Every structure is written in C-alpha cells, then in structure tokens.
Amino acid sequence: TELVLLGDDPGLRVPAIRDWVSVPWGVVSLYETCTGPEDTREQRLDRYTRMRAMVAESLAGFAGRVAPWRAHERPLRLLGTSGTVTTLASLHLDLPQYDRRAVDGAIVPAPAMRAISERLSGMSVAERRGLPCIGRERADLVVAGCAILDAILDLWPAERLGVADRGIREGILRGLINVDGRPGAAGEGEKQ
C-alpha cells in the first residue's frame, strides 16, 4: 500500500511529488497479522477495528509530515487503484459481475465506500463469497483492504474517491508516451 501527496502547483505541467510513504500493510499482511475468531458479527467488527488502528498507527508519521501542505490547499482528491477500491466501486455500482470498463474512471462518494466497508466488515466470509464481484478468491481479504481505505479516509476525509482499474504503471506509461505534449499521443481515439 503506497500513498503519494502530489502538489497542485499551477506552473508545473506534471504534478510534483511532495511526499510519499509505503505502508507495511497490504491486504494479505494485514489479514495475516490481525488474526482472531470471526464466529460472530461482534468478533468480526472487533477485528476490523484493530486492523484500522494498526493502519492508522502506520500512517501517523506521514500524516504529520503532510499536514502543513494540506492546511492551505484545496479540497483533497483521492484516487485509488485496483484491488479493494475497484471491488467496492463494483458493489456501489451494483454490477452483476465485475466490469472493468464500468469501474475504471468511476467517482464514488466516500460515504458510500465507508458504508460498503462497514457492511462487509460485519459479514462472514461465506456471506461475502455470495456477493457479485467479490467471489471466493477475495472474500477473506477484502475486509483488510476496507480497513486500509477507512484508515486513510479517517486521516484525510474526502468527499469522493476516484477509482482506477488500470493501475499506476499504465498511468505512468501513458504519461511517458504523452511526454511530447501532443494530446492524442497516448492513443488516438482512445478514451483518455
């Protein structure tokens, strides 16, 4: 899990990276570290609360470093790539099955993401398996991803969250292709 604070400097063509952090918790490591019984809803919610606290503690130093920049800037824009945010967006869109074209570029209200996270955190693995767009392979791990997202939203409240399915590498590649400044250079006729 990586977080990057980009500057909004009007004179720059490409946003400047002001600070970044690589958090020691991804969904797998957080899920495996924060173990416990999950027989009841209360036990599942307790585990979720502990996961959020662990992530928040890991982000505290970064939050402190970026606070001075955040104090005088416009409202925060968050962008999540792949994994949990795309799963939550697909649930928000009420898709019958995952559809990358519908999810990529979606803008989801942050309160909706939080509500879905809260709902999933109280469900059993079997209940989550039955939801479209989660399935067997993510049913156990998705709650850890929800805890990471909720901890981020606790520290940096935003009205909405942009969702990208294509990932950061594709964005970097498109940026490099478009480095000469020609708007169509990233792929003539493609959705930008």
Residue positions per predicted region:
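Helical "lid/coupling" subdomains associated with nucleotide-phosphate turnover
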Residues: 5-192
